[in-house]
Amino acid sequence: MKYIQTEQQIEIPEGVTVSIKSRIVKVVGPRGTLTKNLKHIDVTFTKVNNQLIKVAVHNGDRKHVAALRTVKSLVDNMITGVTKGYKYKMRYVYAHFPINVNIVEKDGAKFIEVRNFLGDKKIRNVPVRDGVTIEFSTNVKDEIVLSGNSVEDVSQNAADLQQICRVRNKDIRKFLDGIYVSHKGFIVEDM
């Protein structure tokens, strides 16, 4: 079944400006700027005023309508990122061999370096994405905090770190060692 026209509305809070030119969305807010290329998705953007944008699909089937809702979610996440920011807390879990995590710089790029995972001599490196800041928690032992404006970059960095510490060829019910996401939240908390 084809839908003649389906549209979603995106509300823009005060202090945030959204500019759209040939399906490249640029969101500027108090925490910074985010840009997303949406040329591959066939949607129409209409700026009603400075507080409202309409996103529409004409003669679309279920897949196009689903893509419309995806575009709305992506832009909403960008608006949240430039106003509140995203923060992921990760904890190291180990039974015997303590995991050692450091931040190193090689050739101008930052890496998260994981040593002594399950007693391995192998050094695991995870590249840090642009716009993601990493710090170690001062009041909680064995915790690392990833924060940034883009939820895609922060969550992908957390997933990369969790995946590189996956236990292979052992019973994962017994070998629970790894680095896991313990909390997902915002940098600027609502009062």
Swiss-Prot record:
GO terms for biological process: cytoplasmic translation. The keyword Ubl conjugation does not apply. GO terms for cellular component: cytosol; cytosolic large ribosomal subunit. InterPro entries: Ribosomal_uL6-like (IPR000702), Ribosomal_uL6-like_a/b-dom_sf (IPR036789), Ribosomal_uL6_a/b-dom (IPR020040), Ribosomal_uL6_CS2 (IPR002359). Its main location: cytoplasm. Keywords: Cytoplasm, Ribonucleoprotein, Ribosomal protein. Pfam families: Ribosomal_L6. It is found in: Cytoplasm. It comes from the Eukaryota. GO terms for molecular function: rRNA binding; structural constituent of ribosome. The keyword Ribonucleoprotein applies. Component of the ribosome, a large ribonucleoprotein complex responsible for the synthesis of proteins in the cell. The small ribosomal subunit (SSU) binds messenger RNAs (mRNAs) and translates the encoded message by selecting cognate aminoacyl-transfer RNA (tRNA) molecules. The large subunit (LSU) contains the ribosomal catalytic site termed the peptidyl transferase center (PTC), which catalyzes the formation of peptide bonds, thereby polymerizing the amino acids delivered by tRNAs into a polypeptide chain. Present with 76000 molecules/cell in log phase SD medium. Component of the large ribosomal subunit (LSU). Mature yeast ribosomes consist of a small (40S) and a large (60S) subunit. The 40S small subunit contains 1 molecule of ribosomal RNA (18S rRNA) and 33 different proteins (encoded by 57 genes). The large 60S subunit contains 3 rRNA molecules (25S, 5.8S and 5S rRNA) and 46 different proteins (encoded by 81 genes). Belongs to the universal ribosomal protein uL6 family. This is Large ribosomal subunit protein uL6B.
